[in-house]
């Protein structure tokens, strides 16, 4: 609402949208104009859109997209301590004594520690499926965790 000299000039209700999108490989979660294949370009909207979460270009999966910047901030900013859940597929089975180290913190790079929970879900044919729960989700964090544990990620 805009008021000028005690008179209402315009009254607009903000309309917020929230989309659940199955992000395909080859698309990035960025608003930068110079990037090709942005997730937000898959949705026709006249509003500025924000991805809630970051999945790297080679990752597929559910991602939320909204035009509500406050909601995006509350779900993304580390101070709100929101969990992010990932399903990971690997070829290599990792011993439990290795992957439980993530609870206390696992070194994944230069002065970077990842904290979270990994749970082995099932083994199917040659593949092992894992559930990973993190509260941050830094740049390629899940892939770096599995690399540190001695396994490459097939699908994320």
Map each language-model feature to its residues.
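Basic, flexible Lys/Arg- and Gly-enriched helix-loop patches that mediate nucleic-acid binding at interfaces
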Residues: 1-156
């Amino acid at each position: 609402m805009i008021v000028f000299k005690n008179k209402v000039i315009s009254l607009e209700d903000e309309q917020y949208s929230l989309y659940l999108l199955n992000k395909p490989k080859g698309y990035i979660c960025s608003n930068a104009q110079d990037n090709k294949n942005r997730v937000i370009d898959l949705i026709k909207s006249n509003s500025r859109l924000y991805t809630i979460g970051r999945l790297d270009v080679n990752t597929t999966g559910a991602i939320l997209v909204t035009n509500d910047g406050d909601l995006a901030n509350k779900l993304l900013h580390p101070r709100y301590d929101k969990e992010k859940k990932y399903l990971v597929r690997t070829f290599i089975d990792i011993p439990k004594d290795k992957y439980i180290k993530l609870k206390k913190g696992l070194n994944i790079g230069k002065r970077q520690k990842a904290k979270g929970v990994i749970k082995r879900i099932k083994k199917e044919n040659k593949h092992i499926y894992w559930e990973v729960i993190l509260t941050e989700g830094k740049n390629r964090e899940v892939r770096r965790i599995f690399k540190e544990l001695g396994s490459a990620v097939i699908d994320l």
